């Protein structure tokens, strides 16, 4: 490696082989360059494959396709572990692809059961899912096949969760199988005998999974599937009561039994009782939902089974199939029908949950209903834990608390089940929508009519159009199209109710913040309404099918995710009744958008950056000052990443710009880019290509208007900028007065809405001495004219120009800044409340939280953490193309590694990724599959700026890179060494299903670091090496808030909220009641309880205030800036209140 003097980092360390053996890897394997070279299949493998195909009776076409696929993969990748497992993946793909379905009938001879494939290949189901995901990556299978596999895994997960609920519920209704007497072998003519509890247990489960499979729209819906199970138990229980041996079947302690059940002469009623309501109350069900499933899905389906003779008995009241003469044939017919369904569809045979070897086949769970002893062996306990580990690993059916929210929300308690969590979420949704209709309320109608342009009809038309789009995506088999449409209609109706409810709350909040401002402009924003309805639909879908189906809804409505994220915080703040799981789900969605989805090549984000002169705002520009660390060692002035702050004067406030502590308004979120971006283009001069700058883009129309102000003797001309316009303050004009004297004076102008600037001279006399300008506009000095251009936001300022003055020539003053220097005026950065600023504020906050967590786990000092942050911010600001089609966490991990390397505090990528995997959002694909090279669409920016190119970023900004040595690393030296039976390496070249895309190259994180990242960052990172004593100042680091970010409603029945305590200066007038935790006496709590019970407010001057707060601690403390007298008065008041 060539030497680079003191500025060169040390060479990479040798591969940490010893450390790798101690590393516990969660995944089956890693992308590993040091893996053994791939080889062709051996004759032994081919022999095992032939034996496997013979046992499965595989047809020749699928057999040949599977072998060709396996041979191709084994030649390209190292397939570690059991060969049969990989062969099973190839066979499964071949079975699903090789034989087309000609009709909707069954194709029993063509499809091979997945359960048989797994059994013959000696592979558990969970192992199969892990291997299959990697096979899909290597074979680059199309998206629809991947979706099918994901749905298969989700169906399995739902069934596994429901089976764990099925066992205790069944035991609650029926007796234990252990209490049954063993059957005696009888003659052939005496076979028909009453059914047993064990047979009913098996029959009820098979009936349920057969029905669930025939409702594809709810087969992976946890809530509806659970209610379908309750319907099956309700039906079987009603039939059991009709049996002559009912007292041998039913649990005598079941709380749903009738009062006369234990009487000797009790007789069953002709119509079986309904115990849906009792089951819901005992086992976390929703009565309304369960009864709806029973009436609209279950009962019509069971009647069809009677019509097809699959169930025998009395069709009129759906009974009789448990009678001795009918049960055997019914059980046999249902089992056969289910087998045909599994073979035709290719789904998992979910009867394996009932098998004696269920642990080996699933990789999971032992049954509670077993004939053995009640105590489980250590082996069975270990096998039982495998399923839970799978759920924890895949985060199936649960929402992990995002890292940004772990300070505010506890994780679920161990006793909470996925079913109870899902039903609770849906119950909260029903509570929120009680009494509402899918139309605007009278209050909302009145608000909309007050707008200058009533948007009511446009809103209704938009919802109708979106409903039609939503319904079109629910078109399953013809037999169940009506059911699918009914579910789609129901979900959309709930979403409409929620939409109008939230819209009303949002408008009311906007009116409180903006006063009487007309909201027509915002309410006509199509992106806002589509995003809001999509958000409501996502909440409804999540309530029925956790963890939701994001981004399916945004895709069908074609809502750009950059716009969708804006409505999430608005939605959460506007609706206080959301349960914690929904809030976590929405927060997860927002984080996904911020960390990678908004950075896709087709995202509108790149257009926003282009409109901002291809400039990404810094963290200091978008963060409120109180949200930044201000340590003594952090120097702000002169930093290339943290330009010096200048005073802002807003045209709409009449004073200095205030830091933003209140939530950003909807108007700001969806407002157009500020005019400053257009103003800057006027003064941008073309840079030479060698400087790597951005050429000026001069619009064709003239932007500068010379306005002569003549014949004004004895009068004053007032020029008052309207709110939002900008007064340009740094330009010069050559002026000829009446006496012929020519002077050069400063001129000031106003930018109009078309992007042009109209200049006006500062007040001047014939002697050429500039006089003071009234208002807050200061005359420009010679030093200012020699500097760079800037502008100020002004308000309410009158520019007075007496005398006769004519502008002859206007020449912009100042010189073009060199590339790499940041412009230090307020015109060069977006407003803190602009949509682009809001996006990057959230991005920086998210990155800061994740980086702080990683640094704590890696034992990185605060000083190094700030250097890492500065490097990360540099990569976002100066090299935004590094984020295109990549992930925020990838840049964070690379920044940690490079800054630790240059400061001689080496942290291996192996340890960095190990700590990264502990974060809730972590996915192995983030470091396994990183974009290296690929053809992506060019942003049509009209500029030759190298950042507008999305191909190889290594060609960009060459002035920031050098040919010296850099801290490169080999993949084999950092990624964990694969363990036995590990997965194959991640493929590096994917051909893609899209023919118009050239071959895309992906690799692991180390390849990205060596080939792309370090070439962009090396020059900047080396400035912080120990050998460099003149390191640039560090960027301020965002700190983590200590208070809860939102208020919480304590009860749905009372408007009582809990939220962080505000500073005294920010409190509203004291007409409310206050209670300060750890400070106010208990007497106040008694008064509050009395007020809630009676509805009467105590006649006290002090009490409790639980309303929306800011970021202050909840504990009562006096503000530091209060006088001693106020603190003494507060102490006296508290003392008096305690007596």
UniProtKB/Swiss-Prot annotation:
Compositional bias of kind Low complexity: 810-827, 964-973
Modified residues (Phosphoserine): 413, 639, 662, 672, 688, 948, 952, 966, 971-973, 981-982, 1035, 1068, 1080, 1112
Entry PTM: During G0 and early G1 phase of the cell cycle, phosphorylated on Ser-639 and on 5 sites within the domain B. Phosphorylation on Ser-672 in G1 leads to its ubiquitin-dependent proteolysis.
One protein family per Pfam: DUF3452
Keywords per UniProt: Cell cycle, Chromatin regulator, Disease variant, DNA-binding, Glycoprotein, Host-virus interaction, Intellectual disability, Nucleus, Phosphoprotein, Repressor, Transcription, Transcription regulation, Tumor suppressor
Annotated stretches, region: Domain B: 828-1024
Modified residues (Phosphothreonine): 417, 642, 974, 986
Glycosylation sites: 420
A single GO BP: negative regulation of G1/S transition of mitotic cell cycle
Matches recorded under InterPro entries: Cyclin-like_dom, Cyclin-like_sf, RB_A, RB_B, RB_C, RB_fam, RB_N
Cell location: Nucleus
Region (Spacer): 617-827
Keyword Cell cycle: yes
Compositionally biased tracts (Acidic residues): 21-33
Role this protein plays: Key regulator of entry into cell division. Directly involved in heterochromatin formation by maintaining overall chromatin structure and, in particular, that of constitutive heterochromatin by stabilizing histone methylation. Recruits and targets histone methyltransferases KMT5B and KMT5C, leading to epigenetic transcriptional repression. Controls histone H4 'Lys-20' trimethylation. Probably acts as a transcription repressor by recruiting chromatin-modifying enzymes to promoters. Potent inhibitor of E2F-mediated trans-activation, associates preferentially with E2F5. Binds to cyclins A and E.
PANTHER family: RETINOBLASTOMA-ASSOCIATED PROTEIN RB -RELATED, RETINOBLASTOMA-LIKE PROTEIN 2
Complexes and interactors: Interacts with AATF. Interacts with KMT5B, KMT5C and USP4. Component of the DREAM complex (also named LINC complex) at least composed of E2F4, E2F5, LIN9, LIN37, LIN52, LIN54, MYBL1, MYBL2, RBL1, RBL2, RBBP4, TFDP1 and TFDP2. The complex exists in quiescent cells where it represses cell cycle-dependent genes. It dissociates in S phase when LIN9, LIN37, LIN52 and LIN54 form a subcomplex that binds to MYBL2. Interacts with RINT1. Interacts with PML (isoform PML-1, isoform PML-2, isoform PML-3, isoform PML-4 and isoform PML-5). Interacts with RBBP9. Interacts with CD53. (Microbial infection) Interacts with JC virus small t antigen.
Name this protein carries in UniProt: Retinoblastoma-like protein 2
Provenance organism: Homo sapiens
Lineage: Eukaryota, Metazoa, Chordata, Craniata, Vertebrata
